[in-house]
């Protein structure tokens, strides 16, 4: 573990309000233990056929497997996004459930394929996979090769010990003097460095950033009081908090801060499939099945109200 007092670090000012959040946080999360059903037999949430989406599938379109929507999902050790069920072979999680909704809407069977992160770009480009649904962030570089339909916000979360007196971390003043665990070289570290600069300029004490090599050590530091909070990807922290009840969320920031970062279904560029996928997503958003999936996996705060095709991506 390495500790750095960020008063010694110079960080260029960003031309945005340092206290402005891009995500509307519903407030501190309730402390409750959730028992997730990780059985392979658990029924996925389903959606009705969406005739409008089906009609948008290009005439003669060749799916990777006839009659099936073949989706690559990577990182099956990343709950609640993707993990293996209790049979050690079935992919479950919010990503597979989202894929099921799209497959149902398009009148297709779902075929989930476990893929490495390095494999999916070639797999999608070659037609091995119809799409990848694996926490892929829209970037301008990726938009040159792929089409996107958004389905979640990229969200970072502040989590504290469940009994902590800290109720909210929403802006730079809220981190003043706190000890916060963060990953080195990450966008969340960039957020904290910028907020520390704002605090120093306002005469407030900066936060002390702490770096741990593994999550278990980080959680122990929070529970023992050596750290006040963790700041990282919301999904994994939300899952841990729900399982143990030992931590709770007190604030969120968009993962692309100070820009907007979106998570999207990814397809080969220009093959025409992204339009029916977008229509399918909008249908399940309006129909409520999408919300059911997010609630099942504790990801309500990452919800979107409208899917977008190829929105502005993070810069190259």
Locate predicted features.
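Extracytoplasmic small-molecule ligand-binding "clamshell" domains
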Residues: 27-135
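Ligand-binding clefts/hinges and TM-proximal coupling segments of bilobed small-molecule sensing domains
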Residues: 37-53, 187-202, 282-316
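Beta->alpha turn/N-cap motifs
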Residues: 72-78, 113-118, 127-139, 161-162, ...
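Ligand-binding cleft/hinge of the Venus flytrap
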Residues: 84-86, 99-106, 188-211, 241-245
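Short helices/loops that flank or line small-molecule/ion binding pockets
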Residues: 101-105, 113-114, 118-131, 145, ...
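A ligand-binding cleft/hinge motif common to bilobed small-molecule-binding domains
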Residues: 119, 136-143, 191-195, 200, ...
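Periplasmic-binding protein-like
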Residues: 153-160, 242-282, 299-316
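Flexible hinge/capping segments at coil-to-helix
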Residues: 162-180
